[in-house]
Amino acid sequence: MKVYRTDEIRNVVLLGHGGSGKTSLTEAMLYVSGAANRMGKISEANTVSDFDKEEQKRGFSISTSVVPIEWEKAKINILDTPGYFDFVGEVEEAVSAADAAVIVVSGKAGVQVGTEKAWELCDKYNLPRMVYVTEMDVDDASFRQVVEDLTARYGKKIAPHFQPIRENEKLVGYINVIKNAGRRYTDIGQREECEIPDYCLPNLQILRDSLMEAVAETSEEFMERYFNGEEFSEVMDGDIVPVAMGSNIQAQGVANLLSDIVRFFPSPDKRKCVGLNRTTNDMFEANYDFAKAKSAYVFKTMVDPFIGKYSFVKVCSGVLKGDDVLYNAGADAEEKPGKLYTMCGNKPTEVTELFAGDIGAIAKLASTKTGDTLSTKNTQILYQKTDYSSPYTYMRYVVKNKGDEDKVSQALAKMMAEDVTLKAVNDSENRQSLLYGMGDQHLEIA
């Protein structure tokens, strides 16, 4: 993969209820973009995102995966997150590194608790968002119902961009609501122009009215630019929330979504990023400017028994290079990366440099953990650490074999390095060892 400049990058987190289709959407994105020649399936335990044995055994995501997609001369760093609340720490890590979010909603199940939690996270982190409705190839899926439910909850900012064309309860095409133009699917991920069927017109009018209301809430000038396809900031500001739809299994609608991500979502340099310059004790306005002193925030750690420890970083300023000597101000330690990588699931690819705003990984950093900042000794930067949910439930654990205490302690240290919502506590008063987590499922898997 080539090196991308800051304005060519989009960092997008996939959020949503468990089972809504985030991982299968990631697979469809890989396939449609040409990064994969076939789509993995959760049922076959061969998806790029769910590479962990526990994920493959259980059939759902446990940790966040980073998957880079190349589309329309841009690099889209997809952060595929778990949908179950037990693994909320992974979601919070991903959101802290994202510049925008796609909230994934099942067209069959509709708006769920996980949808609402995703929206709240976007509000908390001030993330621009889109909604993508999956499973539109399923008989009883309803795009219109999802749009109506979203509008009832979040108001007129909900802007449907597409309407499904269905025949014999199957998704066969779509109507671009903005352009009032039909497209019919010809093969997986492929489409051609078509007439708008008469039976679609009543629903089309409803969706177009919703779109017009959303746009009218802004300004007349914006309305004109919107329908002319010009660049605008209203989606970036959260005034408009586009809604797209498709089928992950058939890779239908995914190309539209990728194009909308490039068109509507901000590159990192349009977002703010501020830290503390410990050298001068002044505020450091990084703002993902590649011309400034280099700095990066470590938002995630992965400890893999086969490939070792990787620290996932988002470059906040400057350009990171493999031969850099970096400084961890929090740990008062120098770090020598040696090599830089981009990760696709658990597969590292070496790169020569990472521009401000990009997401990558560094192997085997000795003193660096999740939440740390890497910069240079001449310009020592610290960024505020992500505010993670606190573990609230616990279970007692016992070391089976005498003499294995050190082994267990080391294993727990590795687990807690990866998972910020796990916490081991030695209750000396009651002479017991406790492991805290976010729920029974979380503790069981740990």
Model regions and ranges:
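Structural and coupling elements of P-loop NTPases
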Residues: 1-446
